[in-house]
Regions:
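A conserved short coil-to-beta-strand element within the FAD-binding core of flavoproteins
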Residues: 101-115
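Glycine-centered tight beta-turn/hairpin loop motif at sheet-sheet or coil-to-beta transitions
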Residues: 120-122
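Short, well-ordered alpha-helix to beta-strand connector turns
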Residues: 2, 24, 96, 127-128
Length: 132
């Protein structure tokens, strides 16, 4: 049984996953990473956040680290374009190897002391905690 199931693979779900992984808490993220952002954000969009905002609460796989690896400066990328941000998120996921199950939740039931989660790929997961 998982300690935590995270429903949603957007920025907050990925950030929480990285934090739980660092703390060695058993968990999985259910969803398709950044799918909503890729399919629904306007083409050519820029983020309001700057490079000091990133996914890694541990401060290891930051936007600054991503820029440094590519030989770029903050001034060259701010304001941050959506496509560049999505590239950072893909890099972040590669660096952290997060436990992501690319499926959708079809049923969520609270049992006496755990949650039973059914996914559209036929998988069934049990978790003590669920974060949506």
């Amino acid at each position: 049984m998982l300690h935590t199931l995270i429903i949603g693979a957007g920025p907050f779900g990925l950030t929480l996953s990285a934090h739980l992984k660092k703390q060695e808490v058993s968990h999985v993220v259910v969803g398709k990473p950044m799918e909503f952002w890729e399919k629904n954000m306007p083409e050519g969009m820029f983020l309001r956040s700057g490079c000091d905002w990133h996914l890694d609460v541990a401060g290891e796989h930051t936007m600054e680290a991503f820029l440094q690896e590519r030989g770029l400066t903050v001034a060259e990328v701010e304001p941050i374009a959506l496509d560049f941000y999505l590239e950072y998120v893909r890099w972040f996921m590669q660096q952290t190897a997060l436990p992501i199950h690319q499926a959708y939740v079809t049923d969520l039931q609270q049992k006496e002391d755990y949650f039973l989660v059914k996914l559209n790929d036929g998988s069934v997961l049990e978790a003590q905690h669920v974060v949506v």
